Every structure is written in structure tokens, then in C-alpha cells.
Amino acid sequence: MTEKKNRREKKNPREAKVTFEGLVTEALPNGMFRVRLENDTIILGYISGKIRSSSIRILMGDRVKIEVSRYDSSKGRIIYRLPHKDSKRIEDSKDSEDLKDSEDLKDTKDSKD
């Protein structure tokens, strides 16, 4: 007996997409965002179903992973929100230290007078 060959080979649909990291630059209505990719290309991104169902907030300035089709590189699907770096927290703590130092200087000047 001869076996029928599958004329249409099944391909993994994920192979037709490329994943990039990008920065959300603008929030648009209906879960759409403008995202600047690492190669300075700006594309339109929409939230994937899992992110939408788990109520993950995506705001301007967030770093995201976005899946872009090889056939239409102007649109992509946001599949993951990357965790924030602690740079802002470090800046906040430096600012508070500066305030403490300036208050200490005022206290020493007042005690001298």
C-alpha cells in the first residue's frame, strides 16, 4: 500500500513572526500603542489576548516584547511587558539624600547664629 503524502506541510505559525524589544512611545485607543523598536523603527502594536485578559497595564515608557509578522512589518502584537529598571528609584533616593544634606546645612547655620 502506498501512503498518501501530505502535500501541504504544516509549519509552525510562530516561525513566520520575529520578536523585537521596544519602547512604548504613545498610547492609542482600543489597546493600540506606538512602539519604537531597537532599530529605531516605529510600528503600531496591539495587546495580545493573554495580556488583555490578565489586566496587565501598559503605559507610555514601558519596555515591551513585540511579535512582528514577516509579511506586514508595520504592525505587531505586544506579547510581554518587560520589568522596569530601578533607575527611577535610584534617582528618587538621590534626590531625598540631597534634601537631607541641605536640611543639615541649614540646621548647622542656624545653630552657629
From Swiss-Prot:
SUPFAM superfamilies from the UniProt entry: Nucleic acid-binding proteins
Subcellular location: Plastid, Chloroplast
Stretches assigned to the S1-like domain: 8-83
PROSITE patterns in the cross-refs: S1_IF1_TYPE
Keywords tagged on the record: Chloroplast, Initiation factor, Plastid, Protein biosynthesis, RNA-binding, rRNA-binding
Main location: plastid
Gene3D superfamilies per UniProt: Nucleic acid-binding proteins
Gene Ontology molecular function terms on file: ribosome binding; rRNA binding; translation initiation factor activity
Record region (Disordered): 86-113
GO CC field: chloroplast; cytosol
Pfam families, sorted: eIF-1a
Assigned protein family: Belongs to the IF-1 family.
General function of this protein: One of the essential components for the initiation of protein synthesis. Stabilizes the binding of IF-2 and IF-3 on the 30S subunit to which N-formylmethionyl-tRNA(fMet) subsequently binds. Helps modulate mRNA selection, yielding the 30S pre-initiation complex (PIC). Upon addition of the 50S ribosomal subunit IF-1, IF-2 and IF-3 are released leaving the mature 70S translation initiation complex.
Record's subunit section: Component of the 30S ribosomal translation pre-initiation complex which assembles on the 30S ribosome in the order IF-2 and IF-3, IF-1 and N-formylmethionyl-tRNA(fMet); mRNA recruitment can occur at any time during PIC assembly.
Record's protein name: Translation initiation factor IF-1, chloroplastic
Species name: Hordeum vulgare
Origin organism lineage: Eukaryota, Viridiplantae, Streptophyta, Embryophyta, Tracheophyta
This protein's encoding gene: infA
